[in-house]
Amino acid sequence: MSCQPFTSTDTFIPLNSESSATLPLIMHPSAAECLPVSNHATNVMSTATGLHYSVPSCHYGNQSSTYGVMAGSLTPCLYEFPDHTLSHGFPPMHQPLLSEDPTAADFKQELRRKSKLIEEPIDMDSPEIRELEKFANEFKVRRIKLGYTQTNVGEALAAVHGSEFSQTTICRFENLQLSFKNACKLKAILFKWLEEAEQVGALYNEKVGANERKRKRRTTISIAAKDALERHFGEQNKPSSQEILRMAEELNLEKEVVRVWFCNRRQREKRVKTSLNQSLFPNSKEHLECR
């Protein structure tokens, strides 16, 4: 179709006049007849005429499908667009229309249900809780047995893992006052620390045990046994091996203990006599040297 210019002058009538309802709007042929009419525009306009509200068409690329509110379905747009693009040429869509979408309502309800399940506390009778309580009690007993305080454990962990570990952290773990998630994380750290502490303790005990074997434990002799040994010492200060064995059996002591007692008693007797002689004759040594 060829475009021919008008020979007569264009005529415009105000819209608010009485004759505006009967007279059509005259457009220039270059704006009306020369533009191609697309099928998509025809479909959108025909669909919009069947609805009671204006419909913004939402397209993505060259897809043939159209996202938006269609006739017989109140489904919102898949993508969110700025307000000025959605309202260009059409009034904005009312919010109640979008909020009544059953798909969105089901999704929100499912999301709230999952969030509620996440926030719900764990069952206190679950095996994980019982295992955590058992480890907390065992850790406290083994820590005390090794001779470590809560402060010692907190300082040791803080030196390796950071300042977030302290005596308060260990106290709250042993009293089950931490959250389940944090308690599980701390359990693994404390388990490793406990293993290393027990290894160090075993090496220390082995070293101390070797030193104790070199030096026997000091024996305590009762007063009655001392009196009996003093009487035997007055009678015989150098008893034979058979006499020492007989005295040990009578006093319920070891033979080595009785033998050592007589040796120590003779040494003490010698020191007493030497001290007494020096006190009685202080100048005896000088007198002998002068002679």
UniProtKB/Swiss-Prot annotation:
This protein's domain notes: The 9aaTAD motif is a transactivation domain present in a large number of yeast and animal transcription factors.
Keyword terms: Activator, DNA-binding, Homeobox, Nucleus, Transcription, Transcription regulation
GO molecular function: DNA-binding transcription factor activity, RNA polymerase II-specific; RNA polymerase II cis-regulatory region sequence-specific DNA binding
Family classification: Belongs to the POU transcription factor family. Class-1 subfamily.
Cell location: Nucleus
Main location per the UniProt record: nucleus
A Gene Ontology BP annotation from the UniProt entry: positive regulation of transcription by RNA polymerase II
Segments carrying motif 9aaTAD: 5-13
UniProt keyword Ribonucleoprotein present: no
Xref: SUPFAM superfamilies: Homeodomain-like (SSF46689), lambda repressor-like DNA-binding domains (SSF47413)
Function: Transcription factor involved in the specification of the lactotrope, somatotrope, and thyrotrope phenotypes in the developing anterior pituitary. Activates growth hormone and prolactin genes. Specifically binds to the consensus sequence 5'-TAAAT-3'.
Name of protein: Pituitary-specific positive transcription factor 1
Alphabetical list of InterPro entries matching this protein: HD, Homeobox_CS, Homeodomain-like_sf, Lambda_DNA-bd_dom_sf, POU, POU_dom, POU_domain_TF
Subunit structure: Interacts with PITX1. Interacts with LHX3. Interacts with ELK1.
Gene: POU1F1
Domain POU-specific, chain residue ranges per copy: 124-198
DNA-binding region: 214-273
Highest taxon, organism lineage: Eukaryota
GO cellular component: nucleus
CDD domains: homeodomain
